[in-house]
């Protein structure tokens, strides 16, 4: 792997904005040096959300979103560089994930689609950009996700300790770092996505701060069991999912079967859905000594409390304790994956994605010679 400074750019299924991180990366070291967050303008967020939920969209609108996101990513990167007092010449490459608008790994012809024009990112920043990370893995029969477990293994793996890394973003996913066993990782189900959507409808705020609203409600057992009966939760790995499946339509389908539930009780039940669907998968894999949590859901005290209660004997802690910011974990991972791509090294783990082989991920968008 070519040592240098890399920038990772991530906008996840929560659709809150763009996380950008600067890291010094070498073979054995990932050292975060700066970070920046640029929120999505509300109108842009709503347009992306409409596409992600399968609402009809014209090619003109899709192309416009692709271009606008590319420009927004470039703006976030330049703001990060200004904060760090660095120039484009100081950066080896950018790893830009893009915004997933559809992910369908189980169809007859599996595909995934991310937007955010990397040509614009490279042109506007003057920095070589690596993007389109997921489709090469899919071309070899994989799910195209999750890709972050390879990074988790590199930076959080332990020779003797059973560890599981849990990322609670819009979707929750786990990386199983078990000594002597090939790494596995997959999406467990909803993370913050349904919680945020339901909270927005009733409180018009982006998220339920620390789970305070959920704490005022009571879990509706009938609704919880109805949702947990969804076949996704019992499906074997490898598996991945997204907003195209676990969305407001999915929630209302289940609410129609259990009517007249108070809004705060729905929120409390969604917290329990997230926590139980995670805990069940931890237990299914034999448990662990440490559950290392990152992502926005790590700030939800209700989720963290329920995880600790559901997993007695497991230390539930934040990845920040190990020097890796939970807010920036995925952006760091794509900076690391960009470094691997630039060095012609594979970035996927077939034991995680189900691909038939390891492969170099992504496409490189070189900048013009200086």
From Swiss-Prot:
Coiled coil: none annotated. InterPro entries: Anhydro_N_Ac-Mur_kinase (IPR005338), ATPase_NBD (IPR043129). GO terms for biological process: 1,6-anhydro-N-acetyl-beta-muramic acid catabolic process; amino sugar metabolic process; peptidoglycan turnover. Keywords: ATP-binding, Carbohydrate metabolism, Kinase, Nucleotide-binding, Transferase. Pathway: Amino-sugar metabolism; 1,6-anhydro-N-acetylmuramate degradation; Cell wall biogenesis; peptidoglycan recycling. It holds the Pfam family AnmK. It catalyses: 1,6-anhydro-N-acetyl-beta-muramate + ATP + H2O = N-acetyl-D-muramate 6-phosphate + ADP + H(+). ATP binds at residues 12-19. Disulfide bonds: none annotated. GO terms for molecular function: ATP binding; kinase activity; phosphotransferase activity, alcohol group as acceptor. Its EC number is 2.7.1.170. It is an enzyme of class 2 (transferase). HAMAP family: AnhMurNAc_kinase. Catalyzes the specific phosphorylation of 1,6-anhydro-N-acetylmuramic acid (anhMurNAc) with the simultaneous cleavage of the 1,6-anhydro ring, generating MurNAc-6-P. Is required for the utilization of anhMurNAc either imported from the medium or derived from its own cell wall murein, and thus plays a role in cell wall recycling. Belongs to the anhydro-N-acetylmuramic acid kinase family. PANTHER family: ANHYDRO-N-ACETYLMURAMIC ACID KINASE. This is Anhydro-N-acetylmuramic acid kinase. It comes from Proteus mirabilis (strain HI4320). The lineage of its organism: Bacteria, Pseudomonadati, Pseudomonadota, Gammaproteobacteria, Enterobacterales.
């Amino acid at each position: 792997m070519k040592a240098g400074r890399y920038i990772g750019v991530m906008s996840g299924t929560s659709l809150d904005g763009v996380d950008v991180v600067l890291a010094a990366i070498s073979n054995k070291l990932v050292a975060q040096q700066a970070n920046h967050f640029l929120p999505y303008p509300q109108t842009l967020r709503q347009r992306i959300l409409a596409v992600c939920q399968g609402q009809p969209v014209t090619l003109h609108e899709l192309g416009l979103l692709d271009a606008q996101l590319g420009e927004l990513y470039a703006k976030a990167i330049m703001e990060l560089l200004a904060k760090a007092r660095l120039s484009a010449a100081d950066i080896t490459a950018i790893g830009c994930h893009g915004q997933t608008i559809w992910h369908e790994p189980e169809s007859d012809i599996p595909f995934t689609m991310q937007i955010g024009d990397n040509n614009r990112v490279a042109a506007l920043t003057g920095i070589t950009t690596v993007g389109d990370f997921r489709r090469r893995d899919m071309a070899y029969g994989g799910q195209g996700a999750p890709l972050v477990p390879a990074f988790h293994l590199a930076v959080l793996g332990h020779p003797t300790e059973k560890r599981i890394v849990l990322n609670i973003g819009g979707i929750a996913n786990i990386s199983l770092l078990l000594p002597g066993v090939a790494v596995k990782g997959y999406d467990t189900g909803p993370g913050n996505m349904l919680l945020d959507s339901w909270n927005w409808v009733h409180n018009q705020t982006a998220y339920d701060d620390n789970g305070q609203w959920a704490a005022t409600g009571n879990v509706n057992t009938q609704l919880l069991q109805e949702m947990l009966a969804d076949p996704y939760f019992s499906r074997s790995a490898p598996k991945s999912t997204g907003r195209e499946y676990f969305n407001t339509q999915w929630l209302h389908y289940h609410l129609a079967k259990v009517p007249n539930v108070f809004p705060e009780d729905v929120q409390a039940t969604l917290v329990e859905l997230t926590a139980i669907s995670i805990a069940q998968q931890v237990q299914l894999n034999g448990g662990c000594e440490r559950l290392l949590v990152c992502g926005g859901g790590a700030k939800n005290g209700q989720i963290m409390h329920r995880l600790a209660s559901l997993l007695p004997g497991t230390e539930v802690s934040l990845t920040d304790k190990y020097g890796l910011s939970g807010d920036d974990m995925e952006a760091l991972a794509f900076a690391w994956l960009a470094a691997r791509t630039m060095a012609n090294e594979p970035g996927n783990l077939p034991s995680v994605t189900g691909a038939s082989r390891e492969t170099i991920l992504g496409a490189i968008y070189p900048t013009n010679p200086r």
